[in-house]
Structures are given as C-alpha cells and as structure tokens.
Amino acid sequence: MGQIFSRSASPIPRPPRGLAAHHWLNFLQAAYRLEPGPSSYDFHQLKKFLKIALETPVWICPINYSLLASLLPKGYPGRVNEILHILIQTQAQIPSRPAPPPPSSPTHDPPDSDPQIPPPYVEPTAPQVLPVMHPHGAPPNHRPWQMKDLQAIKQEVSQAAPGSPQFMQTIRLAVQQFDPTAKDLQDLLQYLCSSLVASLHHQQLDSLISEAETRGITSYNPLAGPLRVQANNPQQQGLRREYQQLWLAAFAALPGSAKDPSWASILQGLEEPYHAFVERLNIALDNGLPEGTPKDPILRSLAYSNANKECQKLLQARGHTNSPLGDMLRACQTWTPKDKTKVLVVQPKKPPPNQPCFRCGKAGHWSRDCTQPRPPPGPCPLCQDPTHWKRDCPRLKPTIPEPEPEEDALLLDLPADIPHPKNSIGGEV
C-alpha cells in the first residue's frame, strides 16, 4: 500500500509539463475528495497518465473528462479512475451558460442569407472551474496555517495576478484542505497580497457580508455578533464555509489596475514561431485576467497586434486579423523564421601530390604548404646578390659605429698642456 499523502507537507504538487494550472488544480481538488485521502502513489500514477494523455490533447479544447476517461487503460494502477469519476460527476452538475439570443428588431427581422449583416457576437464562456466542495459527511478538518504552508501557496501564485484563474484555483484548493477561519483568511490575504489589494478586498468583502446578513444565512444568529466573528469559531462549520465563499467572491469584485497589464507588452520575436508566441500569450492571460473575464477576444486581438511584421502580413493577406484563433494558427503554421546563421562550406582536402615541390624539391606537399622561404625572382637591385630579397639587403640596415676603447677616451679627457714624461736609457726621468 502506498503511503498516505501528507497534506501539510506539500499542499500543491507540481503539474505535469504541458497542462494548464487551472486544469491541474481541478484534478487535485477531485483527488482530495477521495475517502480515504490520496496517497503519493496515486499522485504519481495520475501525473504519469496525464503525460500519456497529453500526447493526444483532443480532450483539452474544450475540457472533456468523459473523453479523457476513455483513454485510461483497463486495470490502470492507482485511483485515477475514481478521480476521473468525480470530475465527470462535477462537470455534469455545473450548468453550462446558455448563449445570449441574437438581437432582433421589433419592426422587421433581417433574413439569414443577407451577406451584408454579420452574425451576432456570442460571448465565449470562461473556463469552468470546480467549486470548493468538501467530502460528504466528513468532520470539520480546520487546521491553522503554518509558515511552510503559506510559503508554498505564495510560491504558486507568485506569477499570477489576484483574481486570475490560477490565483483563484490555488486559493480554493488551500481553503478546501485547511478549512480556515476568518482570522486565517485575513492572515493569508496579508501574506499574499499588497496592502492596496488587501484594502480593496476588505471593502468588497464588507459589502458582500452586509448583503448576506440582510438576505439571511442559514444558522446565522444576529444576536451572537457579526458574521466575521461567528466564522472564527471552528465549531461553526456552516457559517465558516459561507464566509469562505464570500471571501473568495470578493476577489472577483476587485477593480482593475490603472497601469498597463504585463500581458499587453508580450511581443513576438523576429525568429519566434507563431504557435510559441500564442502559447506565451495564453499563459500570461490565464495568470493576469480576473476570473470570469472573456479571454478569447483579448487573445485574438493580441495574437495579431503583437505579432511580428511577417506574420501580420500573412494574416492580412488571408483576412484573419480578427478570426478565430485556429484560423490564425493555420495561416501562420507554414511560416518559418529566416535562418541568418552562416553555413560553413567544408571542402574536402585534396590528396598530396606525387611530384616534387618546385621550392624545396621534396614530394608529399603542395608548394603553398612548403616551409622553405620563397626564392627571389632575381638579384637584389641594390647589391646584385641573387640570394636575398631587397627588404633583406644588408645595405638597408643602418651601420652602428664601433665604440672607442676606454683608454683612448680617458686620454682625451687629459689637459693638453701637460707634457708627456720621457724615460732615459738608464731608466731615470
């Protein structure tokens, strides 16, 4: 049997490569609803199966857990089948958002075959995420935060903006595992967000709590104090979970930032493939857009406006400046960046010649590779010597005068009026 997975050791396991963060968090939430809890072996088998399933990503766009379950081999180890069964049931319970009816004029309706009138715009639905659900009949599992838990959560949301799908899914997963009180949620907010975001969230939360208290909440007693005070009681499980939902909903009401978002400055490189550029845009929008904001119109607009000039010309020529993303990808899939690297042409070496070299008279090498100096074509024009070039002529070298003997130099320093003594025959002066 596998070892029971410790929730406090690693609240959020790493997703497999190629799977979006909000999809991976759906799998984690479904795994944590298993009774008994998942083991490390179950997570290992889940990641192993998803790596295989990502090779045939027909179940991702849109997400279809029933189709994914059909790819699971029979008798697959672990509890992957149970996790997929929970996801299928949850996806069936979430009602799909109906498309808005097309606007019609009260006087006359235009015919459907009129090519001058464009079809009505249908707002794309936001990616479905699982709500926070606790196992049925499970006792309260409230546990206060530890520093390692807060650090792990902050590491996961470090690249995501407050209110984005990845941010919200990570927070939902943490709320599901720890079942925090109002005080715990306030500590988490101050640890993750800046003081400005925390202040705006506090204002939105106060307005939502006022509406909920006016509307009436199950098991809420106004005489026992405000909802925030009653939610701090670990025994008030129902009120605590109502407060958790209001705390999460306050992120969706945060006003947008006045500065340009980070994803607006993502540009396609001169030699970057178009599909890689669109993938970077998609990840940045997942991490930066508030939850519930339509992503497809922004993605289609940036996929054209921030592309390089060559891809923009291709999209303009085919009329896909604001087409569906699949048409834009197909239009640019044949484009390849120009390879500007120089290719060195290596010529094969010729075999050594059998004839002797005309410089040294030896065979086995070419004259350009000969180590002997090249003989002059004629005699030196200065000295008429045929053995050297003009640049090596000794007449061009400056003559260095020979130094005088030291004795002569000393004699020159003597005064001229001193007579030299003469020795006599007898040796006397």
Curated annotation (Swiss-Prot):
<keyword id="KW-0543">Viral nucleoprotein</keyword>
<keyword id="KW-0167">Capsid protein</keyword>
<feature type="region of interest" description="Disordered">
    <location>
        <begin position="93"/>
        <end position="143"/>
    </location>
</feature>
<keyword id="KW-0597">Phosphoprotein</keyword>
<dbReference type="InterPro" id="IPR010999">
    <property type="entry name" value="Retrovr_matrix"/>
</dbReference>
<dbReference type="GO" id="GO:0075523">
    <property type="term" value="P:viral translational frameshifting"/>
</dbReference>
<dbReference type="InterPro" id="IPR003139">
    <property type="entry name" value="D_retro_matrix"/>
</dbReference>
<feature type="lipid moiety-binding region" description="N-myristoyl glycine; by host">
    <location>
        <position position="2"/>
    </location>
</feature>
<dbReference type="InterPro" id="IPR008916">
    <property type="entry name" value="Retrov_capsid_C"/>
</dbReference>
<keyword id="KW-0863">Zinc-finger</keyword>
<dbReference type="Pfam" id="PF00607">
    <property type="entry name" value="Gag_p24"/>
</dbReference>
<feature type="zinc finger region" description="CCHC-type 1">
    <location>
        <begin position="355"/>
        <end position="372"/>
    </location>
</feature>
<dbReference type="GO" id="GO:0003676">
    <property type="term" value="F:nucleic acid binding"/>
</dbReference>
<keyword id="KW-1015">Disulfide bond</keyword>
<dbReference type="Pfam" id="PF19317">
    <property type="entry name" value="Gag_p24_C"/>
</dbReference>
<feature type="site" description="Cleavage; by viral protease">
    <location>
        <begin position="130"/>
        <end position="131"/>
    </location>
</feature>
<dbReference type="InterPro" id="IPR001878">
    <property type="entry name" value="Znf_CCHC"/>
</dbReference>
<keyword id="KW-0479">Metal-binding</keyword>
<keyword id="KW-0519">Myristate</keyword>
<dbReference type="InterPro" id="IPR050195">
    <property type="entry name" value="Primate_lentivir_Gag_pol-like"/>
</dbReference>
<feature type="modified residue" description="Phosphoserine; by host MAPK1">
    <location>
        <position position="105"/>
    </location>
</feature>
<feature type="short sequence motif" description="PPXY motif">
    <location>
        <begin position="118"/>
        <end position="121"/>
    </location>
</feature>
<feature type="zinc finger region" description="CCHC-type 2">
    <location>
        <begin position="378"/>
        <end position="395"/>
    </location>
</feature>
<dbReference type="GO" id="GO:0019013">
    <property type="term" value="C:viral nucleocapsid"/>
</dbReference>
<keyword id="KW-0946">Virion</keyword>
<dbReference type="Pfam" id="PF02228">
    <property type="entry name" value="Gag_p19"/>
</dbReference>
<protein>
    <recommendedName>
        <fullName>Gag polyprotein</fullName>
    </recommendedName>
</protein>
<dbReference type="GO" id="GO:0005198">
    <property type="term" value="F:structural molecule activity"/>
</dbReference>
<keyword id="KW-0832">Ubl conjugation</keyword>
<keyword id="KW-0862">Zinc</keyword>
<dbReference type="Pfam" id="PF00098">
    <property type="entry name" value="zf-CCHC"/>
</dbReference>
<dbReference type="InterPro" id="IPR036875">
    <property type="entry name" value="Znf_CCHC_sf"/>
</dbReference>
<keyword id="KW-0677">Repeat</keyword>
<dbReference type="InterPro" id="IPR008919">
    <property type="entry name" value="Retrov_capsid_N"/>
</dbReference>
<feature type="short sequence motif" description="PTAP/PSAP motif">
    <location>
        <begin position="124"/>
        <end position="127"/>
    </location>
</feature>
<dbReference type="InterPro" id="IPR045345">
    <property type="entry name" value="Gag_p24_C"/>
</dbReference>
<dbReference type="GO" id="GO:0008270">
    <property type="term" value="F:zinc ion binding"/>
</dbReference>
<keyword id="KW-0449">Lipoprotein</keyword>
<feature type="site" description="Cleavage; by viral protease">
    <location>
        <begin position="344"/>
        <end position="345"/>
    </location>
</feature>
<keyword id="KW-0945">Host-virus interaction</keyword>
